[in-house]
Design a protein with these regions (language model features):
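Surface-exposed, charged secondary-structure patches
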Residues: 2-3, 10-13, 48, 56-100
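Short beta-strand segments enriched in hydrophobic/aromatic residues
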Residues: 37-38, 93-95, 120-123
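Hydrophobic alpha-helical segments typical of transmembrane helices
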Residues: 17, 29-32, 61-62, 75, ...
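Hydrophobic pocket/interface hotspot
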Residues: 21, 33-34, 42, 54, ...
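Short, low-complexity N-terminal intrinsically disordered segments enriched in polar/charged residues
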Residues: 1-36, 40, 127-128
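Acidic-and-aromatic substrate-binding clefts and catalytic sites of carbohydrate-active enzymes
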Residues: 24, 51, 97
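Short beta-strand edge/turn micro-motifs at domain boundaries
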Residues: 88, 100-128
Length: 128
């Protein structure tokens, strides 16, 4: 049986938690970011200069990073839900200046809510 794609109520939930994540990211609300990542050794976040495996590595990165220059504008955001408990979120972003990037997240609904289980952030070469 195939999962139903983008059930309206599930899509609304993931859109809301994605917006909460984005607000926490640009405002450096580390406690919210920590809450929204699955607290597991299996959680993965590949960034522009770091490969983080496990929630402890992700927490250490978030705590140590500079809170300066986190603002960004999102473009071409696509959120897709698969059934009631799985979703992906992909977006492009632009920061002040010319830097541009992309972000992908995999979300799973657990008993305590939606959590990111895998994330990837990369920059786009502006000379293209």
């Amino acid at each position: 049986m195939s999962p139903v794609i983008n059930l309206p109520e599930v899509l609304a939930e993931v859109q809301a938690v994605f917006a909460r994540y984005e607000d926490a990211l640009v405002n450096n609300r580390v406690e919210v970011l920590d809450e929204l990542f699955w607290p597991s050794e299996f959680t993965v976040r590949y960034g522009t200069g770091e490969n983080l495996v496990g929630i402890e590595a992700i927490r250490a990165f978030r705590t140590a990073r500079s809170p300066v220059g986190l603002g960004r504008t999102l473009m071409n955001t696509v959120i897709t839900t698969y059934g009631r408990d799985f979703a992906t979120a992909s977006t492009e972003f632009h920061r002040d200046g010319n830097s541009a990037g992309r972000q992908s997240q995999t979300w799973v609904r657990f008993d305590d809510g939606w959590r990111v289980v895998a994330a990837h952030v990369s920059m786009i070469n502006s000379s293209r």
